[in-house]
């Protein structure tokens, strides 16, 4: 069978001639330009990265994009091919849409910076009743490795035309967050929907309510991959200390955003405040759960960095003198080195 419009239109191939297929329409419907085609029962030899894709990647690189999301990833080689084209500081998100990608999820996570659970095409490639379990499998794998995770497709589909979501949609978003999604994504609801601002507002309300009720204490005892084992251990320790002393926040100084991602992965009770000298890193941390990020001027010593952050937080009236924070950093500063320092600091105590 051949599926169009994420399974809403179904055709059956009855004859093949050279580069043409003749198909019988089993389930018809309205078809628009540039909509995808799925062949769930076939292994296509076409490359995941076309010549046109390469042109788009070069264009995006010239215009300083922060992320690239790669569709129809099959294995690590597809991700590596993209990484050969784009600058090193652009992060790559693998869209998991194919059965082949599920089989190769570990090797994909070895090289990708994050994954997107693209449920629309997954629901065509797999029986629909398997999609919720596959979603959890992908999110668990990403969280275990400390990679960004995004859940997408039809999260508030009814709100393309409706002012209120269905109860099932609210439950779906809540479950995606409880399962460990760093981000939830809207598609048609905002691109062609009647009231995109309202959709974003509803999504935000659901996310905030879920986060306020989510008990994440068990995450501190979860098993992790051995990747970044030292940084992961320090991130876990920072969250444990912050929880035990009821710290107002965890402050992380970062060059790449890796340490804030690992801290975020443990879902601390305290706010996560990050400082970086790099604009791209600040932009990329927008995808991380619970992270607020701020620019900081380059400093030569950790003490200077801490004083700058301390003064900023007081001036912005985020904290008062005497509030406790846990500080995480790598020393010496200004290099892409592993995090090696944790310190409990009282705001104003300098």
Where are these regions (language model features)?
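C-terminal helical cap(s) of enzyme catalytic domains, especially alpha/beta-barrels
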Residues: 83, 190-213, 341-345
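Catalytic P-loop NTP-binding/switch module of NTPases
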Residues: 20-57, 69, 178
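Short, ordered loop/turn segments at secondary-structure junctions
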Residues: 7-8, 16-18, 26-28, 72-75, ...
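Long, charged amphipathic helices and adjacent flexible linkers at domain junctions
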Residues: 45, 93-96, 144, 202-239
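Nucleotide-binding motor/catalytic cores of P-loop/tubulin-like NTPases across gene-expression machines
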Residues: 32, 259-261, 267-304
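Conserved alpha/beta-domain cores
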Residues: 47-153, 159-170, 177
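C-terminal binding/interaction regions
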Residues: 321-328, 332, 340-344
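Short, small-residue-biased leader/transition segments that mark boundaries at the very start
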Residues: 2-3
